[in-house]
């Protein structure tokens, strides 16, 4: 391998809530602080519900504006 062209491969910390995971990476900072817990994502955890941050003004505005919009899905029984 040619020397001097590859980034340094070093210990990398992933911090989620009170948990810390250690792995290896070329990321320059050496750590990442996650504000959303990846373990609670609905793609692999159906009990977690919606993980969208409702405090985000853009998301809240979108939900208010389009709350009654139907995309032709199944109709709810009344």
From Swiss-Prot:
This is Large ribosomal subunit protein bL31. One of its GO terms (cellular component) is ribosome. Keywords: Ribonucleoprotein, Ribosomal protein, RNA-binding, rRNA-binding. Disulfide bonds: none annotated. Part of the 50S ribosomal subunit. It comes from Rickettsia felis (strain ATCC VR-1525 / URRWXCal2) (Rickettsia azadi). Pfam families: Ribosomal_L31. Binds the 23S rRNA. GO terms for molecular function: rRNA binding; structural constituent of ribosome. Belongs to the bacterial ribosomal protein bL31 family. Type A subfamily. InterPro entries: Ribosomal_bL28/bL31-like_sf, Ribosomal_bL31, Ribosomal_bL31_sf. The keyword RNA-binding applies. GO terms for biological process: translation.
């Amino acid at each position: 391998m040619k020397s001097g062209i590859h980034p340094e491969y070093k210990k990398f910390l992933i911090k989620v809530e009170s948990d810390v995971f250690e792995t290896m990476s070329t990321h320059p900072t050496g750590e990442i602080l996650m504000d959303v817990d990846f373990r609670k994502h609905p793609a692999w955890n159906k009990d977690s519900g919606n993980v969208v941050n409702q405090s985000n003004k853009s998301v809240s505005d979108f939900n208010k504006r389009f709350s009654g919009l139907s995309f032709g899905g199944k109709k709810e029984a009344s």
